[in-house]
A protein has these predicted regions:
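Helix-start/capping segments and mature chain N-termini
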Residues: 1-84, 110-212
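Short, acidic/charged, Gly/Pro-enriched secondary-structure junctions
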Residues: 78-107, 124
């Protein structure tokens, strides 16, 4: 076991520089902690190369635009940060998490324009998401909560606040002995699992729900 995520060896890229893992901290009055003003990407590196890395960085910036979180880094700068973390960590096969959020500042109400936008990149070893179930077959619950209509949320943003119903749904699924929960959209169609996409093969073609 690697231990708790706040008590590990290594480094994390934070606001433009590498810091010791245990020193990568934020203030308790960070806006993103209270109001969900945060966007992120979850990526996988194989043999030292991040799968579709640039596309992830582009989506991170786009998520920031959707959420009115102007990320102060370019795609190239985000790419460089991820490579720096992987190299410094000595990892070849890893999970890479890039996250941006509204930090602590002059605002502590709902509005946060005067608060700085901060960013961090961390990487660590993380095995198969479903463990042995990846090979034996994962048992899925049907989530109580549905993915909201795009008229009610910025559904194209990978935003932290949009994952709360996913957390609740996975807790309920695990309590029933399931690996995860399948979530339906607001129309009752299959959308995704709580932290993974769903695919199936029919007549030699791969199908997955449309991103709406």
């Amino acid at each position: 076991m690697a231990g708790a995520y706040d008590d590990r060896d290594g480094v994390i890229w934070m606001d433009g520089e590498l810091v010791n893992w245990r020193d990568a901290k934020v203030h308790i009055l960070t806006h993103g902690l209270h109001y969900g003003s945060s966007v992120f990407e979850g990526e996988r590196a194989y043999n030292g190369k991040i799968f579709k890395s640039r596309e992830h960085s582009e989506r991170l910036l786009k998520s920031g635009e959707y959420m009115d979180i102007p990320i102060p880094y370019s795609v190239d700068e985000i790419e460089a940060a991820k490579e720096e973390v992987l190299t410094a960590s000595g990892l070849q096969d890893a999970y890479v998490r890039a996250v941006c959020w509204r930090g602590s500042g002059d605002d502590m109400g709902v509005a946060s324009e005067r608060n700085p936008v901060r960013m961090a990149v961390a990487a660590w070893e993380w095995g198969a998401y479903y463990g042995d179930a990846k090979f034996k077959g994962a048992k899925l619950d049907i989530a109580k909560w549905k993915r909201p209509s795009p008229e009610t949320i910025p559904c194209f943003a990978k935003a932290a606040g949009l994952y709360m119903i996913c957390t609740m749904s996975k807790h309920a699924a695990e309590a029933k002995g399931c690996s995860d929960a399948m979530m339906l959209d607001y129309r009752g169609y299959v959308a995704e699992a709580t932290g993974a996409n769903l695919f199936f093969v029919k007549d030699g073609e791969v199908h997955t729900p449309t991103p709406d």
